[in-house]
C-alpha cells in the first residue's frame, strides 16, 4: 500500500462482493482504485480477470500510467472506457465494427440544422446530439422521451442521423451499449464466458453511469467495486442519475458502502463552505468530510456593479497572482454557461492576459443572432458584401424570391448588392421601392453611433419581429433569443463606431483560434462541466445570481446545486465568487447558493446597478438622470426638474427603467 489513510485502506482491502466507495472531491479515489487493483493481484487474482472502467480515455490512460509506475513488472489489466470495452466485445463477435466519428456526427447535425432552422450554433448542435444520445439510452426504460428542444427539429435530425448511419453501416457509442446488452441477453454462452473472464470490475465516477451501463454491470457482475460521489452527479443530460448511488443496495443487494473522509485538495474553509452548500440537497448520503490541510484558504465574495466591473476585477487579481510568481495556468475562471465567457474574453484580450478556452469551439459572436446583426453592420460599411446581403435580405421576410437570389448568386458583377438584386430580374414592381428604401436605411447605419445602429436594426428594420416569428415557428422561448440580443448590446457598449466594433469581433475570433492551440501558460476558462475532475490554486466563479446559477431553464435545483458544489471544490487555496448587481442591464438577485453558504446576508441592499449621475430611460417618463441611490430607492430627475423616486427591485424586475450610460 502507498501512503493510504485508514478509510482508503479499508476500501482497498474490502472483501465484500459488491462495494460502493463514496469519494468526495479530493479524497484520492484514483489512488484507491490503483491500489485496489494491486491488492487484488498481490492476492492471486490474474490481471486478465480485472477490468477498470472510466468515462474518458484520458482518465483511463492516467490510471494505466499510474498503475505501471507502482507495478512495472506486472501484466496490466484492462483500463478503458465503457465504450472501449463494448467495442472489444462486439468486434470479437461481429468482426468489423465501424464507428461514426464525433466530428462526422457534429457536421451531419450542423448541416441538417442549417436546412431547417437558423440556429446552427455549437451549443444547438451539441444539444441535438445530447438529446439523440439520451433518447437512445433511455428508450429501453421510458418510451415517452421528451427532447429539450423543438420536437419537430429533434425528430427531423434524429431521422437523418439514423438513416445516415444505416446507409454508411456505422454505429455510434450508444449503439455499442445497446448492441452489447442485446448480445449478452440473447447469447447465454457469451454471457457466461465474459462473467468468467471479468471476475473483478472496478468503476470510476460511478455516479455518471447511465441506465444501460448499470444494466451491463448487473448482468456481468461477479464482483464489482464502484467509486463515485452522488454530490458530483452533473450529467443528467447524458442520462446519469444520483439515484444509482443513493440506492446502491437496491441495484446490488450484496452491496457494502465505505466512505472516504479526507479532502486532500482544498484548504479547510473551502471544504467547510462546500459542505454547507451541498448539505441543502436531500437526495444524497450524509457525509463527514474533513480537510486534511487544516490551514485556512482565502474566500472572497464580491457584488460588482455589472459584468464589466466583474471582468475588470478578475483581470486585476490575476495580474496580482502573476506578479507574485504564480503561473497563469494555476487559475481558472468558471461559469454556468458558455455565453458568460464573452465579457471575460473581451477583458483578457484588452489586458493581454493569455487564456485557454476548454470549450474550443465556442464563440459568442458566431450565434446566428449575432451574425445577423453583424451582417447588417458589415453591409453598411461595404454595400457590395454579398455574404452579408444574402444573410439578411429576408430577415425579416421581404418577399425576395428564391429565383431572384439564384440570379443574384450567379452574377459576377461587383457592385452595390441592392442595385445588383434589382438588375437581376424576378423582382415585382411593388418590391422595388422597399428594396431601395432598405438600401438607404442600411447605408445610413454607418452615419449613426453603434448603439443607435443596433437599435435601428432591431426596431426600425424589424429584426426583433423576425426573432418573434422565429420563436413561434420553432416553439422556442423568445426570452432565450432576447438574452442573446442583450448580451450583444452589452458587448457593443464600449464602442462608438461600427468599424471599431467589427475590428474587435475579428480580434476576438483570432484570439480564440490562437487559444485552441495554446500550450503556453494560460488562464483556464470553462463551464463547470468542463473542469470536473480538475483542480486549480485559484478559482473564480462568476455570475452567481439567480436565473444563471441556478439556471432559469433547469427544473432540477439539486443538480444546479451539485454544479455549484463542483465549482467550489475545484479550488485549492483561493476561491472568489462574484454576484453582479446587474447583468445585461437587468437587476439580479444574489444566488440562493450564496445565501445558503452564508457568504452574503439575506438583507443585502441592492442598487440595481444605478449610480449617481447616470443617464437612464424610463418607459413612462423618458430620459432622466440619477440623483440619489439609497436603501433600495433610486431618485431620478426627468425633464425640467421633475423628481421621482422608485423602488429599485420593482422597476428593475419589471424592466421599467434601463441604464443608458
Segments and roles (model prediction):
Residues 46-49, 222-223, 229-231, 252-257, ...:
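Short glycine-/polar-rich loops that comprise or flank the Walker A/P-loop
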Residues 78-86, 202-205, 227, 500-552, ...:
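Conserved helicase core region in the C-terminal RecA-like lobe
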Residues 20-33, 253-256, 262-355, 380-382, ...:
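Helicase P-loop NTPase motor core
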Residues 295-297, 326-448:
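ATPase/helicase motor core of nucleic-acid motors
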Amino acid at each position: 500500500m502507498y501512503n493510504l489513510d485508514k478509510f482508503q485502506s479499508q476500501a482497498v482491502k474490502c472483501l465484500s462482493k459488491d462495494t460502493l466507495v463514496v469519494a468526495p472531491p479530493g479524497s484520492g479515489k484514483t489512488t484507491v482504485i490503483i491500489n485496489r487493483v494491486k491488492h487484488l493481484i498481490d492476492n492471486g487474482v490474474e490481471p486478465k480477470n480485472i477490468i477498470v472502467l472510466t468515462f474518458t480515455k484520458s482518465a483511463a490512460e492516467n490510471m494505466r500510467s499510474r498503475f505501471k509506475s507502482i507495478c512495472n513488472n506486472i501484466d496490466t489489466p484492462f483500463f478503458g472506457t465503457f465504450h472501449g470495452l463494448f467495442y472489444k466485445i462486439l468486434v470479437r463477435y461481429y468482426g468489423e465494427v465501424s464507428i461514426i466519428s464525433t466530428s462526422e456526427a457534429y457536421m451531419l447535425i450542423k448541416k441538417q440544422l442549417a436546412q431547417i432552422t437558423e440556429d446552427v450554433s455549437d451549443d444547438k448542435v451539441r444539444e441535438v446530439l445530447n438529446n439523440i444520445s439520451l433518447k437512445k439510452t433511455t428508450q429501453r426504460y421510458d418510451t415517452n422521451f421528451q427532447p429539450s428542444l423543438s420536437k419537430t427539429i429533434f425528430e427531423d435530425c434524429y431521422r437523418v442521423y439514423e438513416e445516415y448511419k444505416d446507409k454508411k453501416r456505422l454505429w455510434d457509442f450508444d449503439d455499442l451499449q445497446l448492441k452489447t446488452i442485446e448480445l449478452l441477453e440473447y447469447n447465454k454462452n457469451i454471457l457466461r464466458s465474459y462473467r468468467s473472464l471479468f471476475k473483478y470490475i472496478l468503476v470510476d465516477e460511478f455516479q455518471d453511469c447511465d441506465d444501460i451501463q448499470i444494466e451491463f454491470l448487473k448482468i456481468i457482475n461477479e464482483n464489482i467495486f464502484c467509486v463515485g460521489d452522488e454530490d458530483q452527479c452533473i450529467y443528467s443530460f447524458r442520462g446519469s442519475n444520483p439515484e444509482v448511488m443513493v440506492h446502491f443496495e437496491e441495484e446490488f443487494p450484496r452491496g457494502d458502502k465505505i466512505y472516504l473522509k479526507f479532502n486532500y485538495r482544498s484548504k479547510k474553509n473551502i471544504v467547510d463552505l462546500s459542505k454547507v452548500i451541498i448539505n441543502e440537497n436531500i437526495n444524497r448520503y450524509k457525509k463527514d468530510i474533513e480537510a486534511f490541510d487544516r490551514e485556512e484558504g482565502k474566500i472572497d465574495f464580491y457584488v460588482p456593479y455589472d459584468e464589466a466591473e466583474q471582468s475588470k476585477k478578475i483581470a486585476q487579481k490575476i495580474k496580482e497572482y502573476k506578479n507574485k510568481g504564480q503561473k497563469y495556468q494555476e487559475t481558472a475562471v468558471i461559469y454556468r454557461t458558455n455565453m458568460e465567457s464573452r465579457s471575460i474574453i473581451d477583458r483578457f484580450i484588452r489586458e493581454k492576459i493569455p487564456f485557454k478556452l476548454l470549450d474550443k469551439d465556442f464563440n459568442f459572436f458566431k450565434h446566428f443572432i449575432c451574425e445577423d446583426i453583424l451582417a447588417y453592420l458589415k453591409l453598411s460599411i461595404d454595400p457590395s458584401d454579398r455574404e452579408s446581403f444574402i444573410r439578411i435580405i429576408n430577415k425579416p421576410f421581404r418577399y425576395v424570391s428564391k429565383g431572384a437570389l439564384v440570379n443574384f448568386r450567379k452574377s459576377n458583377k461587383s457592385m452595390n448588392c441592392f442595385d445588383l438584386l434589382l438588375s437581376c430580374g424576378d423582382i415585382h414592381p411593388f418590391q422595388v421601392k422597399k428594396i431601395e428604401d432598405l438600401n438607404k436605411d442600411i447605408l445610413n447605419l454607418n452615419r449613426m453611433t453603434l448603439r443607435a445602429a443596433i437599435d435601428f436594426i432591431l426596431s426600425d428594420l424589424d429584426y426583433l419581429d423576425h426573432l418573434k416569428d422565429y420563436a413561434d415557428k420553432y416553439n422556442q422561448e423568445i426570452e432565450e433569443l432576447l438574452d442573446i440580443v442583450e448580451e450583444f448590446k452589452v458587448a457593443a457598449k464600449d464602442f462608438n463606431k461600427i468599424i471599431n466594433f467589427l475590428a474587435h469581433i475579428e480580434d476576438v475570433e483570432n484570439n480564440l483560434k490562437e487559444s485552441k492551440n495554446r500550450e503556453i501558460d494560460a488562464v483556464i476558462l470553462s463551464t463547470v462541466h468542463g473542469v470536473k475532475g480538475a483542480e486549480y490554486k485559484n478559482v473564480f466563479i462568476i455570475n452567481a445570481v439567480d436565473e444563471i446559477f441556478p439556471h432559469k431553464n433547469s427544473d432540477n435545483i439539486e443538480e444546479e446545486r451539485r454544479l455549484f458544489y463542483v465549482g467550489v471544490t475545484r479550488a485549492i487555496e483561493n476561491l472568489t465568487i462574484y454576484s453582479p448587481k446587474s447583468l445585461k442591464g437587468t437587476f439580479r438577485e444574489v444566488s440562493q447558493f450564496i445565501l445558503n453558504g452564508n457568504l452574503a446576508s439575506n438583507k443585502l441592499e441592492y442598487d440595481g446597478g444605478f449610480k449617481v449621475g447616470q443617464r437612464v430611460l424610463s418607459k413612462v417618463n423618458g430620459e432622466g438622470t440619477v440623483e440619489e441611490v439609497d436603501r433600495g430607492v433610486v431618485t431620478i430627475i426627468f425633464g425640467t426638474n421633475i423628481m421621482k423616486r422608485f423602488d429599485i427591485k420593482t422597476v428593475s424586475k419589471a424592466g421599467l427603467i434601463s441604464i443608458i450610460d
